[in-house]
């Protein structure tokens, strides 16, 4: 039986065939198992010798089964590896090249310019308290921005900030002058969306406070930003304008030649000298928090600009909605320049 079983084991070409041989000989109803079960019918003096002989046969068959099973599994694995072989010398599949979003690139450029001028970069909460967004910035109750139709109000009385200026107040409450900061972040306006307006957009705002800060310092800062952003030939101009948190206030524009060779003035943002009422509001908040009043007699300037507008002008994007449409056909056009 042993020789026959081993021949059948060696002749099995698949794991299924080997399992059939195993069942035939050492399964629950196998030939060897039956022989062991019949030992009880033998005379007592013969059982021990016959049992030992059958166990030797069973062990030999099991050893042959194990060896054959290992060989068949190795062969199956080798065949699978051969069928799935990868030529590691072939070039890999190219990954699509990424690129910076136009807004990110403009922001990085501006941050780099202001860091070179010694500005610290900070961020603030997008969900803001009404006092920080309006009252502390000298925005009166009758200002249009405080209307329900122009601001996203939350049920608890807070709001989505309409500008990054609240961080001026928060920073001054926690810090004493002199300092130079720029604030970056998203702002929200409750208005209809069209080619030039979005309910959410990005701002970069600057604040400088110290002794003897003047309008000339502000103009020099804006001019330096213009040259850093648009080249050494860029020029800046200022026109009087009203903003409740600065006095005097101005709009600023940059004279720039675009990639198509067209030169014109581009309005970029607003600026001005920090209003004395803003400094007073900050000192009031500091006093309420147990801090010294340190802003009386100080001067400073602030400025703010929209990043989407700069990117639209710089890259010739006609519609602000393209920035957030997640359309790879649009953003992919800037991969070479922005990547």
From Swiss-Prot:
It is found in: Cytoplasm. Belongs to the class-II aminoacyl-tRNA synthetase family. Phe-tRNA synthetase alpha subunit type 1 subfamily. Tetramer of two alpha and two beta subunits. The lineage of its organism: Bacteria, Thermotogati, Deinococcota, Deinococci, Deinococcales. NCBIfam families: pheS. It is an enzyme of class 6 (ligase). This is Phenylalanine--tRNA ligase alpha subunit. One of its GO terms (cellular component) is cytoplasm.
């Amino acid at each position: 039986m042993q020789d026959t079983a081993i021949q059948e084991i060696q002749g099995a070409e698949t794991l299924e065939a080997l399992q059939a041989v195993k069942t035939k000989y050492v399964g629950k109803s196998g030939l060897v198992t039956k022989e062991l079960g019949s030992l009880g019918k033998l005379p007592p003096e013969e059982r021990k010798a016959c049992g030992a002989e059958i166990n030797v046969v069973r062990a030999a068959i099991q050893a042959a089964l194990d060896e054959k099973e290992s060989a068949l599994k190795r062969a199956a694995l080798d065949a699978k590896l051969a069928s799935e072989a990868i030529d590691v010398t072939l070039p890999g599949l190219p990954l699509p090249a990424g690129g910076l979003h136009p807004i990110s690139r403009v922001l990085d450029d501006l941050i780099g310019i202001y860091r070179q001028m010694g500005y610290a970069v900070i961020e603030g909460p997008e969900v803001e308290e009404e006092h920080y967004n309006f009252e502390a910035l000298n925005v009166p109750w009758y200002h249009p921005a405080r209307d329900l139709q122009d601001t996203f109000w939350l049920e608890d009385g807070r709001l989505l900030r309409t500008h990054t200026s609240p961080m001026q107040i928060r920073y001054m409450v926690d810090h004493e002058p002199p300092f130079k900061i720029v604030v970056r972040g998203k702002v929200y306006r409750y208005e209809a969306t069209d080619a030039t307006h979005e309910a959410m957009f990005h701002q970069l705002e600057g604040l400088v406070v110290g002794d003897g800060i003047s309008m000339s310092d502000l103009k020099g800062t804006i001019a330096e930003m213009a040259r850093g952003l648009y080249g050494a030939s860029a020029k800046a101009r200022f026109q009087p304008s009203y903003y409740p948190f600065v006095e005097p206030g101005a709009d600023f524009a940059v004279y720039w030649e675009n990639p198509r060779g067209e030169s014109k003035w581009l309005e970029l943002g607003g600026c001005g000298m920090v209003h004395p009422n803003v400094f007073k509001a900050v000192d009031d908040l500091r006093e309420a928090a147990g801090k010294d009043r340190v802003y009386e007699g100080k001067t400073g300037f602030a400025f703010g600009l929209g990043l989407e507008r700069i990117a639209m002008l710089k890259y010739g994007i006609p519609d602000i909605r393209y920035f957030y449409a997640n359309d790879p056909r649009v953003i992919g056009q800037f991969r070479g320049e922005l990547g």
